[in-house]
Curated annotation (Swiss-Prot):
A biological process term (GO) from this entry: double-strand break repair via homologous recombination
Keywords carried by this UniProt record: ATP-binding, Chromosome, Coiled coil, DNA damage, DNA recombination, DNA repair, Nucleotide-binding, Nucleus
Organism classification: Eukaryota, Viridiplantae, Streptophyta, Embryophyta, Tracheophyta
Protein name as it appears in the record: Structural maintenance of chromosomes protein 6A
Residues of the Zinc-hook domain: 23-1049
Encoding gene, per UniProt annotation: SMC6A
Amino acid sequence: MDEHGDHRQSNPFNDQQTSSGKILRIRLENFMCHSNLEIEFGDWVNFITGQNGSGKSAILTALCVAFGCRARGTQRAATLKDFIKTGCSYALVYVELKNQGEDAFKPEIYGDTLIIERRISDSTSLTVLKDHQGRKISSRKEELRELVEHYNIDVENPCVIMSQDKSREFLHSGNDKDKFKFFYKATLLQQVDDILQSIGTKLNSANALLDEMEKTIKPIEKEINELLEKIKNMEHVEEITQQVLHLKKKLAWSWVYDVDRQLKEQNEKIVKFKERVPTCQNKIDRKLGEVESLRVSLTEKKAQVACLIDESTAMKRELECLRQSMKKAAREKIALEEEYHHKCSNIQKIKDRVRRLERQIEDINEMTIRSTQVEQSEIEGKLNQLTVEVEKAESLVSSLKEEENMVMEKASAGGKEKEHIEEMIRDHEKKQRNMNAHINDLKKHQTNKVTAFGGDKVINLLRAIERHHRRFKMPPIGPIGAHVTLINGNRWASAVEQALGNLLNAFIVTDHKDLVALRDCGKEAKYNNLKIIIYDFSRPRLDIPRHMIPQTEHPTILSVLHSENTTVLNVLVDVSCVERHVLAENYEVGKIIAFERRLSHLKDVFTIDGYRMFSRGPVQTTLPPRPRRPTRLCASFDDQIKDLEIEASREQSEIQECRGQKREAEMNLEGLESTMRRLKKQRTQLEKDLTRKELEMQDLKNSVASETKASPTSSVNELHLEIMKFQKEIEEKESLLEKLQDSLKEAELKANELKASYENLYESAKGEIEALEKAEDELKEKEDELHSAETEKNHYEDIMKDKVLPEIKQAETIYKELEMKRQESNKKASIICPESEIKALGPWDGPTPLQLSAQINKINHRLKRENENYSESIDDLRIMHGEKEQKIGKKRKTYKSCREKLKVCKDAVDSRWNKLQRNKDLLKRELTWQFNHHLGKKGISGNIRVSYEDKTLSIEVKMPQDATNSAVRDTRGLSGGERSFSTLCFTLALQNMTEAPIRAMDEFDVFMDAVSRKISLDTLIDFALKQGSQWMFITPHDISMVKSHEKIKKQQMAAPRS
């Protein structure tokens, strides 16, 4: 029993907490004993306590009044004006409800809060519904009733609001029928039962009345049915007689019209056949024009390819010549730059020497005046020392310059090496990307071989063909590459694929209609430029005579190909001449086969390494290999994927190695630049020291000269002469320097021009190489197009000769025979009746003469049988039928409509009645489970027996301290506390079976002792918190033992005034 009770407690509907429909606050003005009372309620459990007479019960009464209850329904007054406080003229009940969540009542109108305001005066009572802003929305009773039904707030249901009168009534009642009435009303079963019984009674009465009314028209309906049967039969006999006459005339002319139909069909056939002649001839002429145009274009393209090959060879030689000239010009420019810098350095040294001589002249003049014997002696010593230091400094400067030049050359070489390594890295990365792309393509082809011959577009095309397969006379074959394999492994795969090219992507159809259908499928699959070949699928495998094949020991493409489809091999022979394409091992062998042996019936030679060679008259052509791509005709792509993965891994290793070399070169370059900066700094410092010491030495020399009493004027003159000599040398060197600078500019200009010419020529050569490859592809396409056009032209010529013209001749012969037959049939039919009578009968429906003959015989037999049965006049029968039908027609229509409506109502009542019976049984079981579950909290067990037939509800309670183990069947035999607790358990069991956003209980703990009240309160609170509705408990007793909880709100009413 407890298991079922726990199961009910954990019902997710009961556990769902919703804020919609709960009371936020109530305000009473001049209502019963309250002048102005306002109470705010919590969303969960609310306790209202106070002394007797404090107006606790008036709150429940006010709620009942606000929700539309009549005064007598509250059991507190006879009329609503009795609720007005003595001495006042009106009473006001103001209730504020939450209106939030999914169950909100018209939230777009009322908002989050809904207000019910009922004002009662001596003469009137008005209920107003307001929105969350206090604006009046409605004052209609229907709106309030809709609100109450929406939230299921039935204040007369004791499970929603149990007043103190109802509590005492149940406690004092020992009658099982009264308990049943309480249960039946609380679960709303009473209301549903009464409504269904009332409807059932009314339906039975209506059915009985309708049956009586329908019986009154039964005799007349029987007479009408008999008349209708007679009229119908008589009309049918007349129709049959007239039909026989018309059929005989039609039969006579049907022979004529049948021949006319045959003549028309034959004439349409002749016209259709003749329409084919210009169409077919136009196709032949158009294909013939295409063939001639393609032949001219093919000859021009071959000449263009040969010219492009010669031009590309000459371009390569010119490129190499320009590259050598560019290198030579660069070397000359570098040599001139070095010479220019060297001469600039010499001129600067001479200028420095001149400046020193000028300072020396000035110093001599000064020294002459102030020199002494002692100073001259010291100057000589210093002069010797400075001479040694200058020589040493000059030696160090020279060695540092040489070392700096060496480091600079190494740094320049290191920079060029770094650029070369970066270029290598870019080349390897590009190769690796291409290899990875090829690997991905091969893996895709390995999963589905068809994708190798058109990619995803061919898959979409095949699906479109499957969807529209009914449009094709024969299913298309393709792509061709998916239907062929190589016999000797993958050895010749690259050469065969180079020879067949885009032909491997082509599809084959049997006629022009299938070609149009396949093009439509291609457009749907977004497969543009789809190559389609028309070929007769019924044609057997072509038998090629041996003398028509090149006589060589080397294989042809046809000999290395295999296909299960004969049509595919025939197309390869007719379109691509695979029996005339010879395969060779390498360039040398291919050259011997193509140009030296002069084999008959040889068209092209293809080598494994990619060369194509052919001879057309005296012109010998060799096309270079194209960039290698993964072959698509391999039996297995594993080897290619493995080889490409090894090459990609090798390229990755090369990239890593080059990156290591780059890092090493960068480190070396940084070291050289650091060394160069250090050497330059040391050299600059030494040059400064050298200049300073040379000046000091010159000063000392001047001092020595004055000591030897040399003529200062003579020394100064000599120095002036030396300065003039140096200045003249400077002028000569600067003149030479200007000439050298002009030569340097010319060399630089020449180097730049050569470089630009090389780059332009390289770009031009690149374009010509690409143009050569493009021209080769176009040449192959032109050859394929020419062969395809010739095949289609021959196909249309065969159709014209073997099909179109013979069909026209045969159809004309048949037409002449039918014209003679028509003349004979027309002559015979005119004897029976003129053709105008047949036309007057209406349009010809087209039956054959045999069909008409059989129809006439069958109708004659039936007409004979019908004439034997009836002798009345059909007009009299129709008059009698019209009179009787008019008499009862309106009644019958009315009765039928009523019967249909009653049936719909009866079905609905039966469905609801069955559902009510099922719900009764479920509610009875659940009541017992819940009751026993709640009793168990006090150690009591019990049982409830409900009899819907006897309309009784009996309660059995078994006390744990009862040694007799007997159950108490009358609650009046229990103590006051036990009776109140059992009543509470019964009420909670009913509460758990009903829905309502608010519930209230007044003086539920009457007659309870302290222990029973404690258990009852705990039970009530646990139930209320789990159940999820808003609860209001009103009691005059102390509730201090109620545990504190955030969801429990306690309020104390003020004591009544004495």
